[in-house]
Amino acid sequence: MALAQEEYRKQEKMNGIIYDISPSPNFRHGIVSGNLHAIIKNGLKHSGCLVFMRNLDFKYHPEKNDDYVVPDIMIVCDRKQLKGGCYDGVPKFIVETLSPSTALRDRTEKKVAYEKAGVEEYWIVSPQGSVEIYYLEDGKYVLVSNYILQNDKEEEDYNGEDVISLRAFPHISMELREIFEGVDS
């Protein structure tokens, strides 16, 4: 088992500092990211765009240095900017699924990096049932929606059927509960 984890070693480099990215801390992280990836991939058919899940480095300012991150989910439409295992264009959409070891960096350094790179839409998703949606407006991220899943249909504040759409791809939509399907199994 130690060998398998050693082989997985993935890293990010931000502001010249190298961070090890551990494998998903628990199954919930993988389920949430997998659910989103499946919905988005299905919606991108015949669009010319691609969705990547934790397997493509994003060089967020290649003209300045060699810093890069590995978003949990990223949509790219400019295939000319794909070079080996890296993308140095501007993604249309990025999702970071929070884990204890990355939550602070996802909310601070990565958010600023994505904002400066010009990523139009950024979602921060917690496997515990929340989704924060940021849109880039005049060069700054603005929180436009913040969902906390209330999945008990008997409760007055049930919102599992609330529909969320991607800004750049409004035909790609999902119910809030679909993002977290299987997490409590």
Residue map of PLM features:
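Gly/Pro/Ser/Thr-rich low-complexity, intrinsically disordered segments predominantly at protein N-termini
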Residues: M1-S185
